[in-house]
A protein has these predicted regions:
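Active-site helix/loop module of the DD-peptidase/beta-lactamase fold
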Residues: 64, 80-133, 137, 161
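Active-site-proximal alpha-helical segments within enzyme catalytic domains
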Residues: 124-128, 177-183
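Short, charged, amphipathic alpha-helices and their helix-cap/turn boundaries
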Residues: 44, 95-96, 123-124, 138-167
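Active-site SXXK
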Residues: 11, 15, 38, 64-95, ...
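Short, conserved catalytic-motif segment at the N-terminal edge
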Residues: 4-65, 85-89, 102-109
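Short Gly/Pro-enriched turn/cap motifs at secondary-structure boundaries
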Residues: 21-22, 113-116, 147
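Cytochrome P450
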Residues: 170-176
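Residue-level signature of the cytosolic catalytic core of signaling kinases
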Residues: 3, 7, 118, 148-149, ...
Length: 183
């Protein structure tokens, strides 16, 4: 059931007011409301694209949602596990779907690299136990990647191929995922 014009207008006014004062409010936002039937009930943008920006927020503005993609990909993966399409603990399947995982090395404390002893599974990717990390969380990885100019946020696939921080399945580190849809 669509929103009546009065409710639609009232919601848009609330969104606009939230973005009026750039100092005490929010710079800009896009709000989309979808009914349980999947139909769009409201789509409205207000304010600017960021603090200090004069570019207006629009329904076509692109957002960097960073690690929120992990939640979306995790749900999608678990739906595929439920359907029997993916397996949580099959390293051969996971590395077959993401062949770049096969050649990853493990970064040792002395800065040298060693071969992986185990394959990487979907469960490891989803639970941050595959060995991936971020340079800003891990000094050893930062020291290794800095001289070669690797930047995990560049969008280049070669920069995503940083070494693992530990053998797959033998530790935990919040980090990038090889199944990251941004790459």
């Amino acid at each position: 059931m669509p929103l009546n014009e009065q409710v639609h207008s009232h919601l848009c006014d609330i969104i606009d007011k939230a973005c009026e004062d750039q100092k005490s409010g929010i710079p800009g936002t896009t709000v989309v409301v979808v009914g349980k039937d999947g139909n769009e009930l409201l789509a409205h943008s207000a304010g600017n694209r960021g603090a200090g920006s004069n570019d207006p927020m629009t329904l076509d503005s692109i957002f960097w949602i960073a690690s929120c993609t992990k939640m979306l990909v995790g749900v999608a993966c678990m739906q595929l596990v439920e359907q029997g399409v993916l397996k949580l603990d099959d390293a051969e399947q996971t590395e077959g779907l993401c062949p770049e995982l096969k050649s990853l090395k493990v970064l040792l404390p002395d800065g040298s690299l060693e071969e992986k002893k185990h394959g990487i599974t979907l469960r490891m990717l989803l639970t941050h136990t595959a060995g991936f990390g971020y340079t800003f969380f891990n000094e050893r990885l930062k020291q290794w990647s800095y001289p070669i100019g690797a930047d995990e946020f560049s969008g280049r696939i070669e920069d995503m191929k940083l070494p693992l921080l530990f053998q797959p399945g033998e530790g935990w580190q919040y980090g990038v995922s090889a199944i990251n849809p941004e790459s």
